[in-house]
Design a protein with these regions (language model features):
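Conserved C-terminal beta-signal and adjacent last beta-strands/turns
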Residues: 8-9, 240-243, 425, 483, ...
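Short, acidic, small-residue-rich periplasmic hinge/interaction motif at the N-terminus
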Residues: 23-63, 102, 526
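Extracytoplasmic beta-strand/coil segments of soluble accessory domains associated
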Residues: 71-113, 135
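Short acidic/polar hinge/loop motifs at secondary-structure boundaries
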Residues: 113-141, 160
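Transmembrane beta-barrel wall of Gram-negative outer-membrane proteins
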Residues: 176-207, 212-249, 287, 292-302, ...
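Face-selective signature of the C-terminal outer-membrane beta-barrel domain
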Residues: 287-452, 473-477, 481-484, 525-531, ...
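Membrane-embedded beta-barrel scaffold of Gram-negative outer-membrane proteins
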Residues: 305-311, 473-486, 507-563, 568-572, ...
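Gram-negative outer-membrane beta-barrel transporters
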Residues: 430, 533-535, 555-654
């Protein structure tokens, strides 16, 4: 074990002051780092684990972190596609892996689930600049290893918060760029105090006007931790959270306007009494979220470690919007009779839709390493309680409003999620290892109250899942080959229940995942190939069918799959130049897909839906080809990187209709920087990024809706246009 002798004392405050009290200390840094690794060892894969994964280091995160949301730092990971509502990667963003949406990707921070328990999604607008407090991120593709929480149904993103830094430090970073984008971060730590204590803290603020009109965002976040180390003991408390206000840009841009004003934003649009088109200024999303983790790790014996984590998250917020010509009936109000004696069915109003929730639980992990065996036992229990309610804040017909802040719906969702797993890797020989992973997961979910669309809701469902995984791994010299089979299950989310109506309740989905791969690592190059076949049973998809309450119905389809090959590699072209890249070729299909289209007569009277049997079709938002390439130059403090990516055609629905699709696009980003180390501080670094270097006009997401009126089909589609060439410059000071 490496030991470091040093003199330290003092608290480095965020104002930059340092007070020093010298004392000799002997610190086993390897021991400190190993205790931190125990926290994530239960959910992160090791090299010999037979799954496809990529590790993103802290250095890579810091190098590319210039204010965009975290998924934009994954763009050079195989099979990852990202999109942004505002167009410039700040605020509301989302990611897909192998075409799998975020509601099917499991996200954890130090093993604690991050996915929303009800929607299964992750809202990165609530985690601005979280990359500045992350030590490493592992992105597993496919079913992956057993983890905690919902949505482990196609990919896993396991994040580890920053390791303790044993010497005092202070860093400040400011970035400014196109579309009024500013990102500021200060972070610091005490180093080791009294040979036992470490304190770290960060504060960040990110602001932007957005590429899309009015897609402004103002987001602040913080991270703070206090850790205690003593021999084989680690106790750490950490808290992180954020507040955000962002103007809505959820509607996208219709296809006609893409050619004339691709930055147009229809959110908040209304027409006043004089017939003048205006935009409601407070058409915003507002949210506050705070996470609290208490982690304890104890080395019980040589090779045996126990970790226990308690966690609590509270969140609250609302989005406010202007509703023109809203029906009184939707807001549980009678029609209004005006002074002229005529009944009015509609009015203009402003509403707020609220969510207040609490999420808390406990996790335990026991890791054992001895000779040929590595084993992990884990268990967790998590409880969620969330109140959904809506209020009318203003109404044009003031007399029709029953009371201020009139509440027109309220429901409560409660979810108990518990699991236990045992996974082990056993070395059968010097080169061959066997892997097994068994998980049981149980869910109790209820929704009661009233909904803004469905009226009364009364859902009570329980699920019990058994998720086995097994595989073999062979490693000799620089060669590594593996094969695995895994089963995963996913319960329906809140929307699947509330918008399907009482007589069309969905059931769970099942994934059978087959993976096989090969990697070679040499002195100057590495390459890898991974084959996958993901076979779905009862996958939930939109078919166009309308539920009995008039909402789009998500239906369980019996037969669908994703299969493909992922290639990756890298080479050192010169001592100062590296290249790395990846390619994914895939086929993503639904067998026997049936489309349902809303149908009307010439006078817009509702007719039965038109049914189209389309046979085998492509799964929406699943490009058949993606690739990425990075040239990385580094010489005497100078750095430069040229990063390129290509995303093939993505269909907006499951019909494989080219007219309802997103065109393929190719992007390149350039980053150049210089860092030097003056005698009075650790480092001064300046870098400049040019995003979308070749000024491509492209869209990365969207939606579509079709109807038939008097025998003619028409389609409305919205596309999320992304920023053309734009710039970002950053200055970083390290003390």
């Amino acid at each position: 074990m490496r030991k470091i002798f040093y003199s330290v004392a003092g608290l480095l405050t965020l104002s930059g002051g340092v007070s020093i009290t010298a004392q000799q200390a002997v610190v086993d840094t390897t021991n400190v780092y190993e205790l931190n690794e125990v926290v994530v060892s239960a959910v992160q894969a090791r090299r010999e684990t037979p799954v496809a994964f990529r590790n993103v280091s802290a250095a890579e995160l810091r190098e590319n972190n210039t204010g965009q949301s975290l998924p934009y730092l994954f763009t050079q990971t195989p099979s990852v596609v990202v999109t942004s509502d505002g167009g410039n990667g700040v605020g509301y963003v989302s990611m897909r892996v192998r075409g799998t949406d975020a509601g099917r990707i499991n996200f954890t921070v130090d093993g604690v689930p991050v996915n929303d328990s009800e929607s299964h999604g992750v809202f990165w607008v609530n985690m601005p600049d979280f990359a500045s407090s992350v030590e490493s991120i592992q992105i597993q593709r496919g079913a992956g290893t057993s983890t905690n929480g919902a949505a482990a149904f196609g990919a896993t993103v396991a994040m580890q918060t920053q390791r303790p830094r044993l010497e005092p430090y202070f860093e400040a970073s400011s970035a400014a760029g196109s579309y009024g984008t500013f990102a500021h971060t200060v972070r610091g730590g005490t180093g080791l105090i009294g040979n036992h204590f470490v304190f770290d803290a960060r504060y960040s603020n990110v602001q932007t006007d957005g590429y899309i009109e009015r897609a402004r965002a103002n987001m602040s976040s913080y991270y703070a931790s206090a850790a205690y180390y003593n021999g084989g003991t680690m106790i750490k408390f950490q808290t992180f959270g954020s507040s955000e206000v962002s103007y809505q840009a959820w509607n996208g841009v219709d296809s006609a306007r893409l050619r004339t004003n691709r930055r147009y934003n229809s959110c908040g649009e209304y027409t006043d009494e004089n017939g003048v088109k205006k935009f409601y200024d407070n058409q915003t999303d507002n949210y506050w979220q705070h996470h609290y983790h208490l982690l304890a790790t104890q080395r019980l014996t040589d090779g045996l470690n126990l970790n226990v984590t308690l966690h609590y998250t509270d969140g609250r917020g609302y989005y406010e919007d202007y509703k023109a010509r809203a029906k009184y009936a939707v807001y549980k109000l009678p029609n209004y009779t005006g002074a002229d004696g005529k009944a009015q069915k509609r009015t203009d109003l402003v509403r707020r839709k609220w969510l207040q929730n609490d999420f808390y639980g406990a996790l335990a992990r026991l890791t054992y390493t001895r000779d040929r065996l590595q084993a992990v036992w884990g268990a967790s229990i998590n409880n969620y309680a969330g109140d959904h309610f809506g209020r009318v804040m203003w109404m044009k017909t003031v007399e029709a409003m029953p009371r201020p802040d009139y509440e027109y719906y309220r429901s409560r969702g409660e979810k108990l999620d518990y699991n236990t797993f045992l996974k082990a890797s056993y070395r059968l020989s010097n080169a061959l290892s066997a892997y097994a992973d068994l998980q049981y997961r149980g869910i109790n979910y209820s929704i009661t109250g009233t909904d803004d669309k469905a009226g009364a809701i009364d859902v009570h469902r329980t699920f019990s899942f058994f998720n086995p995984k097994a595989g073999l791994s062979y490693e000799r010299g620089g060669n590594h080959a593996y094969a695995s089979f895994a089963v995963a299950h996913r319960e329906p989310n809140r929307k699947n229940f509330t918008e399907n109506g009482p007589s069309a309740q969905p059931t769970y989905e099942t994934l059978y995942d087959y993976e096989a791969g090969y990697e070679y690592t040499g002195r100057a190059f590495h390459l890898g190939a991974n084959l996958y076949y993901m076979d779905y049973d009862n996958q939930l998809v939109l078919t166009g069918k309308i539920s009995e309450i008039g909402e789009p119905l998500t239906s369980n389809i019996k037969d669908s799959y994703r299969m493909g090959v992922e290639l990756s590699g890298g080479v050192r072209l010169a001592p100062w130049l590296d290249w790395s890249g990846h390619v994914t070729l895939s086929s993503n299909k639904i067998r026997g897909f049936t489309e349902y289209v809303d149908t009307y007569d010439k006078d817009w009277n509702v007719l039965p839906q038109t049914v189209n049997e389309l046979g085998t079709t492509d799964i929406a938002f699943s490009p058949n080809l993606t690739f990425g390439s990075t040239f990385d130059f580094h010489w005497r403090g100078f750095t430069a990187a040229l990063m390129s990516s290509y995303v093939g055609r993505q269909y907006l629905d499951n019909t494989s209709a080219r007219e309802r699709s997103i065109d393929p696009y190719f992007l390149s980003d350039l980053r150049v920087g210089y860092a030097f180390h003056p005698h009075f501080m650790k480092e001064i670094a300046l870098d400049v990024s040019v995003r979308n270097l070749f000024n491509a006009e492209y869209e990365s997401g969207g939606w579509t809706y079709s109807s038939i009126q008097d025998g003619r089909r028409s389609t409305s589609s919205g596309y999320f246009a992304q920023a053309t060439r734009n710039f970002m410059a950053r200055l970083t000071l390290k003390f």
